């Protein structure tokens, strides 16, 4: 029995994976729309949050009538309030892909995770901005198929043992969406 014998002849051509070519013709018209959402009033108690950007109300409302939507920019802002100087609050934030198993308790163990002390005598009273590294995850928030690696924000809050009467900071998510291919819907009602 010959082991080296080829049972079925194979084409010796080397094939290279290619990217699908762009569809000929003009590219679709896009609409760029800024958005901002208050996602957490923090500081009155310890809290954790995990927010997928595609599911935030302002994003889903803006993308309702479009087939495709991508993030052009994305950031989280931590806004100190009047209570911050008296009641310092620790805020941890981290941007991860939506399918990441990382939890808010693991922010400091994750690349890009940051911890801030909001308020107090010598700590920041200015808004803090943490940009999302969109080049490290999928910026698409709406498409013909569902993606599992769009941006997700992890937040961890550690409040003072003596809780303040109101929030020490407000956390907002802001950015710019690029949308195209309007859905055809009946608007007569």
From Swiss-Prot:
Gene3D superfamilies: 2.60.120.20. The keyword Glycosyltransferase does not apply. GO terms for molecular function: structural molecule activity. GO terms for cellular component: T=3 icosahedral viral capsid. The keyword Chloroplast does not apply. Transmembrane segments: none annotated. The modification N-acetylmethionine is found at residue 1. SUPFAM superfamilies: Positive stranded ssRNA viruses (SSF88633). This is Capsid protein.
